[in-house]
A protein has these predicted regions:
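Active-site-proximal alpha-helix that buttresses catalytic centers in soluble enzyme cores
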Residues: 1-266
Length: 266
C-alpha cells in the first residue's frame, strides 16, 4: 500500500490581497473549534471581523512574506519538499483554512496512488483550536479501505527537543534570560487538552537540552474580550525585565513548526 505524508498547518491566505485575507479570516473564525459560540453568533461575527481586519492582516502578512508569496505557504511547502527528499515518500503541504486545503492535499495524494496517509499537524502541542480542528477535518475525508494515521502532538519528542536546543545554540546567549513564548488560548479551552502543561514540558526539556538554568513560559496573541486567557503575556514580561535593568533577552517560539502570522509579527 503506497504511503504519503501530509503536513497540515493552520492556514494562510492564498495570495497577498485583501480579498484573500478576508476569505481566510472568515473561514478561520467560522470554525467552532476556534470560536466556541453558536452558529447564529459565530457566522455573522466572523463576517464582520473579517471585513474589518482584512487590510490590517494583509499589512502584517506582507511584513513576513517574501517574493509576493505568503510566508506560511512558502514555509510549509518548503518543509514538505525537504521531508520528501529525506524519506523518499511523497509529501504534501496542506492548510486547515485558505490556501491548499486538506481536501485538496488528500485528493492529490490519492491521485498519486497513495492509500496509507500519515498526517502531521504543524503544532507540537495540542490545542482544540489547532490540532483538534485539523483532526476533525482530516477524518471527514477518509474513505473505506484507506489508512489514516494522525500524530496528535510531539511536544516532548526527542528529535524535536534536540532541534530546538541546536537552534538555541546557534542564536541564543546563555548570559541572558530566556523566554519561551507560546500562542495563548482561553483558559476554558486549555482544560480540555492540557495545552499549557505540554508547553511547560517543552520549555523544561529545552532548558535541560540547551544547558539553561531556566526557561520562563510566556504567552502571546491574547485576543482579550470576556474570556480569561493564559498569561503572563510576553510583552508584559519583557517590559518587567527591562524595568528591572535587564538589557537583553532570548525569545524562542516553539509552538508552530512553520510559524503563524501573529507569532512571527509579534
Amino acid at each position: 500500500m503506497k504511503k504519503a505524508f501530509i503536513l497540515v498547518n493552520t492556514g494562510s491566505p492564498a495570495e497577498l490581497s485583501a480579498a484573500a485575507c478576508k476569505t481566510f479570516l472568515r473561514e478561520f473564525l467560522s470554525d467552532p473549534d476556534v470560536v466556541p459560540a453558536p452558529f447564529f453568533v459565530r457566522y455573522p461575527l466572523a463576517r464582520v471581523i473579517a471585513s474589518k481586519r482584512a487590510e490590517a492582516y494583509l499589512a502584517n502578512l506582507k511584513k513576513i512574506s517574501r517574493g509576493g508569496v505568503p510566508r506560511l505557504v512558502e514555509a510549509c511547502a518548503g518543509l514538505a519538499r525537504k521531508i520528501a527528499a529525506m524519506t523518499g515518500t511523497e509529501t504534501f503541504a496542506a492548510h486547515r483554512y485558505g490556501a491548499f486545503p486538506v481536501a485538496e492535499a488528500i485528493r492529490a495524494a490519492r491521485d498519486s496512488g497513495a492509500r496509507d496517509f500519515r498526517f502531521l499537524p504543524m503544532f507540537p502541542q495540542s490545542a482544540s483550536s489547532t490540532t483538534f480542528s485539523v483532526k476533525r477535518e482530516v477524518f471527514a475525508h477518509r474513505r473505506e479501505g484507506e489508512v489514516f494515521r494522525f500524530r496528535e502532538n510531539y511536544f516532548d519528542d526527542g528529535a524535536y527537543i534536540s532541534a530546538l536546543a541546536a537552534l538555541f545554540g546557534r542564536f541564543g546567549d546563555r548570559s541572558l534570560p530566556t523566554l519561551a513564548s507560546f500562542h495563548s488560548v482561553p483558559v476554558s479551552q486549555d482544560g480540555k487538552t492540557g495545552y499549557s502543561a505540554q508547553c511547560r514540558k517543552t520549555a523544561g526539556l529545552l532548558a535541560s537540552a540547551a544547558g539553561l538554568a531556566d526557561v520562563s513560559v510566556v504567552w502571546q496573541s491574547q485576543m482579550g474580550g470576556p474570556l480569561k486567557w493564559l498569561g503572563p503575556s510576553a510583552s508584559a514580561e519583557i517590559g518587567r525585565l527591562s524595568a528591572s535593568g535587564v538589557d537583553g533577552v532570548n525569545v524562542v517560539c516553539p509552538g508552530f513548526a512553520c510559524g503563524c502570522t501573529e507569532t512571527l509579527v509579534e
